[in-house]
Amino acid sequence: MKPLTPRQAEVLELIKANMNETGMPPTRAEIAQKLGFKSANAAEEHLKALAKKGVIEIMPGTSRGIRLLLEEEEPLEESGLPLIGKVAAGEPILAQEHIESHYQVDPALFHPRADFLLRVQGMSMKNIGILDGDLLAVHKTQEVRNGQVVVARLDEDVTVKRFQRKGSQVWLLPENEELSPIEVDLSCQQLTIEGLAVGVIRNADWM
């Protein structure tokens, strides 16, 4: 990767921080406002420069179409972030049998630090650029806030959704207008928060 200019590094850090706080990248207008650019077009130029340097991918047609790009290393040894595949009911998500491989990704690239990668299945979060086959970087925690994108386990299913809670009621909200929210009553249903989404990685070689 070519070195980033100070301004490009600032834009990249803002993208990471926004994903940490809200679970999604910022819009061009938000970047311009937070960094003092005169217009969203100025933010777009910095994003294009980051894309040319291989740091992000710009997805056309969506205001939040920004995705981190990393290259896969050959998994010659079991180091790096574990990639979680299908999760068996009742087993810890990081159980050895769930780990498909490891990626040579620096956990400190994300904030909070990523603890594992989860292969995304389906298009329920497509509106914020989380697509089928993507690798979701996850910080393992049960402490999450309303509005954050989480990895949740409900009965036998592991799902990626936006978290909303009021009292004993939890809503797992999709970012796809064709799908309905999942409503959970904690007084009679078991819901486990496996972690907080802290970034999305797309590897074209895996697609």
From Swiss-Prot:
Function: Represses a number of genes involved in the response to DNA damage (SOS response), including recA and lexA. In the presence of single-stranded DNA, RecA interacts with LexA causing an autocatalytic cleavage which disrupts the DNA-binding part of LexA, leading to derepression of the SOS regulon and eventually DNA repair.
Residue ranges of DNA binding: 28-48
Gene: lexA
Protein name: LexA repressor
Cross-referenced NCBIfam families: lexA
GO molecular function, one term: serine-type endopeptidase activity
EC number: 3.4.21.88
Protein species of origin: Aeromonas hydrophila subsp. hydrophila (strain ATCC 7966 / DSM 30187 / BCRC 13018 / CCUG 14551 / JCM 1027 / KCTC 2358 / NCIMB 9240 / NCTC 8049)
Protein keywords: Autocatalytic cleavage, DNA damage, DNA repair, DNA replication, DNA-binding, Hydrolase, Repressor, SOS response, Transcription, Transcription regulation
Family: Belongs to the peptidase S24 family.
